[in-house]
């Protein structure tokens, strides 16, 4: 069933990255980052479009050189999704991509340079109505902070962030969001909690360098889940050493699990045991692949026997409960006379889910499909 989340989100100010609202109650935006060579325009554009196809709201692109900045110009012309330029070391690159229509600038306080350079970036951003993300990272803190704290600590990440928030405040620039990422879950979580008490600007969440697809997804789910459950977070990125498309899928899965933002089908499936009347695991895997194109939020329960099947089906849009040779089918929690042959479950259930998705899409207000 389509249920609202009980989480009360932190109040924050509103900015826009392109046409995507961030903060002040807007849907939490899911983003990823390209891992192609930015100078390979064709490959980068293809990856951006692949990310957009699986639901990305925003895509970040690394722009390490002036040659990459020139490539960014071409990339921007060939894509429609809002793009963030990731800038390190050379502030002049930020000024260049601003000319080319970048939707947001990410700068790293640990390496972007002195206040005068930041001032140049801020004045350019103000003139061109471009928001900024202050992106603090536990792996690249300023030298004086490392000398002071000896290692990355929540207080060190907070001080780095607030140092640059204060600069933007002095420059009367409020169109920014902030992140304080770390690869350690507890370090990141505590840093974000401290920061959330200090500022009203939107917060971008992430566990940086989280790891490969499996371990990184788990680490991100634990860390971001703790923060999101506290109501903290306005955008997020799942950092995986994997195909960036997987980052978007995991991001939506986390939001879906917390009922914060639902996109696509939430499969409720048993791990299976000797009581299963059909192959639950292969059924779920096949349906997940076939139904990736559905964006309508739905709960579908697929349970291999009658122990928990009927109970889960009662609170699902569509439910399947394993039976001897034929499995029971539920629609909106009501058992139907129709039963599914256990040898043809995938095709039959796919057809029912697609038909149901069309019905659900019609009864849920259009604006809620993006929540």
Curated annotation (Swiss-Prot):
The record's listing under SUPFAM superfamilies reads: Enolase C-terminal domain-like (SSF51604), Nitrite and sulphite reductase 4Fe-4S domain-like (SSF56014)
Q: What is its EC number?
A: 1.17.7.3
Entry's Gene3D superfamilies?
Dihydropteroate synthase-like (3.20.20.20), Sulfite Reductase Hemoprotein, domain 1 (3.30.413.10)
Identify the residues that bind [4Fe-4S] cluster. Answer: 270, 273, 305, 312
What does the note accompanying the cofactor annotation read?
Binds 1 [4Fe-4S] cluster.
UniProt GO BP? isopentenyl diphosphate biosynthetic process, methylerythritol 4-phosphate pathway; terpenoid biosynthetic process
Is Nucleus given among the entry's keywords?
no
Alphabetized UniProt keyword annotations: 4Fe-4S, Iron, Iron-sulfur, Isoprene biosynthesis, Metal-binding, Oxidoreductase
Q: Which InterPro entries match?
A: Dihydropteroate_synth-like_sf, Enolase-like_C_sf, IspG_bac, IspG_bac-typ, NO2/SO3_Rdtase_4Fe4S_sf
Job description of the protein: Converts 2C-methyl-D-erythritol 2,4-cyclodiphosphate (ME-2,4cPP) into 1-hydroxy-2-methyl-2-(E)-butenyl 4-diphosphate.
UniProt protein name: 4-hydroxy-3-methylbut-2-en-1-yl diphosphate synthase (flavodoxin)
Give the gene that encodes this protein: ispG
């Amino acid at each position: 069933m389509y249920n609202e989340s009980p989480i009360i989100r932190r109040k924050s100010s509103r900015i826009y990255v392109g046409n995507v609202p961030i903060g002040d109650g807007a849907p939490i935006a899911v983003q990823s980052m390209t891992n192609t060579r930015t100078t390979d325009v064709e490959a980068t554009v293809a990856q951006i479009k692949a990310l957009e196809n699986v639901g990305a709201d925003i895509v970040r692109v690394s722009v390490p050189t002036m040659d990459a900045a020139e490539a960014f110009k071409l990339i921007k012309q060939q894509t429609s999704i809002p793009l963030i330029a990731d800038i390190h070391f050379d502030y002049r690159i930020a000024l260049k991509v601003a000319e080319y229509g970048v939707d947001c600038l990410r700068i790293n306080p640990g390496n972007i340079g002195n206040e005068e350079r930041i001032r140049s970036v801020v004045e350019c951003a103000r003139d061109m109505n471009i928001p900024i993300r202050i992106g603090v990272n536990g792996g690249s803190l300023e030298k004086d902070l490392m000398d002071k704290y000896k290692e990355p600590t929540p207080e060190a990440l907070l001080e780095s962030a607030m140092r640059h928030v204060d600069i933007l405040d002095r420059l009367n620039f409020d169109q920014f969001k902030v992140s304080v990422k770390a690869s350690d879950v507890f370090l990141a979580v505590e840093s974000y909690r401290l920061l959330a008490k200090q500022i009203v600007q939107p917060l971008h969440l992430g566990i940086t360098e989280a790891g490969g697809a499996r371990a990184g997804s788990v680490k991100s789910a634990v860390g971001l889940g703790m923060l999101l459950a506290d109501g903290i977070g306005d955008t997020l990125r799942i950092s995986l050493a994997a195909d960036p498309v997987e980052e978007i899928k995991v991001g939506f899965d986390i939001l879906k699990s917390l009922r914060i933002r639902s996109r696509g089908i939430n499969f409720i499936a048993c791990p299976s045991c000797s009581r299963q009347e059909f192959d639950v695991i292969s059924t779920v895997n096949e349906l997940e692949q076939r139904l990736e194109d559905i964006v309508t939020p739905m709960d579908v329960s697929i349970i291999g026997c009658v122990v928990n099947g009927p109970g889960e089906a009662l609170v699902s849009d569509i439910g399947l409960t394993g039976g001897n040779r034929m499995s029971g089918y539920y629609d909106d929690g009501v058992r139907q006379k129709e039963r599914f042959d256990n040898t043809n479950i995938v095709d039959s259930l796919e057809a029912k889910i697609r038909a149901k998705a069309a019905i659900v899409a019609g009864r849920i207000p259009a604006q809620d499909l993006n929540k």
